[in-house]
């Protein structure tokens, strides 16, 4: 284990011996590392067989957290590892794509679409990523896919 990863685990109150387990604050290291954009830690945790289906207190998975961080390396590592790209959180029903579209993260939207994110999923309030697109570029990206039927 690299010293910077050991330090990160210790500084965030995770077990060095069992690095994929939650800390005392009920936070999963994969979620926090993704949220912080720590691709090195995310890759390490994935190598340690971190569960891909863990969620935070709001029901968001690690992919959502990586999208929040706007970190394409974390997003790519999680998608490559097989994270559920279309996971819908329990609170709003939003997916990572819906979140990214609604917050103007254009690069993230492009990356998720290239990986096959479902554009037809809806929030509990019946909104799709297209409905919530925050920028013209995102609107164009999503509307081209919806019109083509992909």
What are these regions (language model features)?
Residues 1-11, 115, 124-127, 131-150:
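Ankyrin-repeat-protein effector appendages
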Residues 1-36, 40-43, 47, 147-150:
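Intrinsically disordered, low-complexity regulatory segments in ankyrin-centric signaling systems
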Residues 16-19, 52, 85, 119:
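Ankyrin-repeat inter-repeat connecting loop/turn
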Residues 20, 45, 78, 112, ...:
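Conserved hydrophobic site in ankyrin repeats
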């Amino acid at each position: 284990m690299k010293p910077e990863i050991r330090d990160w685990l210790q500084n965030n109150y995770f077990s060095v011996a069992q690095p994929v387990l939650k800390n005392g604050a009920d936070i999963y290291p994969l979620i926090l590392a993704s949220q912080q954009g720590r691709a090195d830690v995310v890759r390490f945790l994935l190598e340690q067989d971190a569960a891909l289906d863990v969620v935070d207190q709001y029901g968001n998975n690690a992919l959502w957290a990586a999208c929040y961080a706007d970190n394409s390396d974390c997003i790519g590592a999680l998608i490559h590892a097989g994270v559920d790209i279309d996971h819908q959180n329990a609170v709003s029903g939003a997916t990572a794509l819906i979140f990214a579209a609604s917050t103007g993260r254009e690069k993230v939207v492009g990356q998720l679409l290239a990986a096959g994110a479902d554009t037809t999923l809806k929030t509990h309030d019946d909104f799709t990523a297209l409905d919530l697109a925050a920028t013209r570029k995102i609107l164009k990206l999503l509307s081209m896919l919806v019109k083509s039927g992909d």
